[in-house]
């Protein structure tokens, strides 16, 4: 049967009869070199059924190199490696003897000129793509840390990664570095726990006390003392927040301004003193059990504790100095001068609420997300600033030209209106009256919704990932702690069994002698 043309062409298709496979006319399929073939000649993967001994002639050895990575073989021309002389594969060309070859690869087959590398073949696929195409990309299913080790082994710089892959690669490396820092902070604690069972009785007693103190202060899940200590800390933070709110009542403020102190004011001061005393004791205990005092003082939560505790003592010192300098003729002039400073210092007591981050996984996740999403927060702020700078002057000009009674007196006032409008708060203190002004307001509202939605997605994914990481880390610490306790109990039980055997044999010998 002859194929019939469907496009009214006059080409003779009779030679393409299906009766035989040998009827293909060479004129219909002209021989030409494919562009893809030229591109992929730089490197190719060999199939298992390929006969390597047929291509192991002397001429092929001079032109081709066979790489065996984890059991998968690749064929590369030597000219491909000339472009990458500093890589591990490029160093093979400079090898002059068998020892030099083995210093670069793991094994070498002289008969087939085959170099063996005991490495991950999946990662080498991306390396091979870089050698033949000049594009280095990180596959989604590949571990970034393993890929970093492969890059170091093959001698390829990370700068060759494409932009999108490099961003994801560096993010994973940064997250791993943060996890290693947290594990290094916990490693001295675990090592001290293991060293606390030393042979010296005095050192063992001191180490045991420090370990129990550390468990109570830093590890709420370690036992009953840690849970009680954490509950007391949260309770005192709550009492401090309530006490700060009560101290701002109008009646107490009037008494404070008049220099008087009623029973309620005295009770508020006593509650505040007790809470500050507890926080000071907690800070002292944390400082005593810290393995590195300098690292403890540099931590953000420690700085928050200092900023929250010191205003109380500074206020006491200032009040004492004011009472000593006060004269009957001057009244409260000195207190009037430092009154603003005292009010600011007392307002810093609200930072006690940040202490809840020690016991809340959610607050820790929030802080870690804010540290990781600084770029996204910067973009959000930039978007809002550009939009505010655009809509505020435009609304000011429109309202002052077209509205009968304009409410926008200046461009800075329009800035405030733009911030409230774009964040969809809408106080309603300033409202555009003209129709063009209302159109500008609608545009600013829609722009604010869209601009805030762009970075929020990335921030949400970062928050979810950070929460999972911290939760897994917390579970890992609990498992490590449980394993340590099980190991300790097994050692103690073994020692008790040995002592029973020892003393039991001694008592039996005594009975035999008797």
Curated annotation (Swiss-Prot):
Keywords: Cell membrane, Ion channel, Ion transport, Membrane, Potassium, Potassium channel, Potassium transport, Transmembrane, Transmembrane helix, Transport, Voltage-gated channel
Cellular component aspect of the GO annotation: voltage-gated potassium channel complex
Gene Ontology terms, MF aspect: potassium channel regulator activity; voltage-gated potassium channel activity
Example of a GO biological process term: potassium ion transport
Superkingdom of the organism of origin: Eukaryota
Annotated compartments: Cell membrane
InterPro entries in the record: BTB/POZ_dom, Ion_trans_dom, K_chnl_volt-dep_Kv, K_chnl_volt-dep_Kv6, SKP1/BTB/POZ_sf, T1-type_BTB, VG_K_chnl, Volt_channel_dom_sf
Biased composition (Acidic residues): 180-196
Location of the region described as Disordered in the Swiss-Prot/TrEMBL record: 180-205
Segments on the Extracellular side according to the record's topology features: 247-267, 322-338, 397-411, 432-438
Bilayer-crossing regions: 225-246, 268-289, 301-321, 339-359, 375-396, 439-467
Cytoplasmic face residues: 1-224, 290-300, 360-374, 468-514
Membrane topology: Multi-pass membrane protein
Pfam families referenced in this protein's UniProt entry, alphabetically: BTB_2, Ion_trans
Sequence ranges marked intramembrane in UniProt: 412-423, 424-431
Annotated motif Selectivity filter, positions: 424-429
Function: Regulatory alpha-subunit of the voltage-gated potassium (Kv) channel which, when coassembled with KCNB1 or KCNB2, can modulate their expression and their gating kinetics by acting on deactivation upon repolarization and inactivation during maintained depolarization. Potassium channel subunit that does not form functional channels by itself.
Subunit structure: Heterotetramer with KCNB1 or KCNB2.
Written domain comment of the UniProt record: The transmembrane segment S4 functions as a voltage-sensor and is characterized by a series of positively charged amino acids at every third position. Channel opening and closing is effected by a conformation change that affects the position and orientation of the voltage-sensor paddle formed by S3 and S4 within the membrane. A transmembrane electric field that is positive inside would push the positively charged S4 segment outwards, thereby opening the pore, while a field that is negative inside would pull the S4 segment inwards and close the pore.
Family under the similarity heading: Belongs to the potassium channel family. G (TC 1.A.1.2) subfamily. Kv6.1/KCNG1 sub-subfamily.
PANTHER family recorded: POTASSIUM VOLTAGE-GATED CHANNEL SUBFAMILY G MEMBER 1 (PTHR11537:SF88), VOLTAGE-GATED POTASSIUM CHANNEL (PTHR11537)
Name assigned to this protein: Voltage-gated potassium channel regulatory subunit KCNG1
Natural source organism: Mus musculus (Mouse)
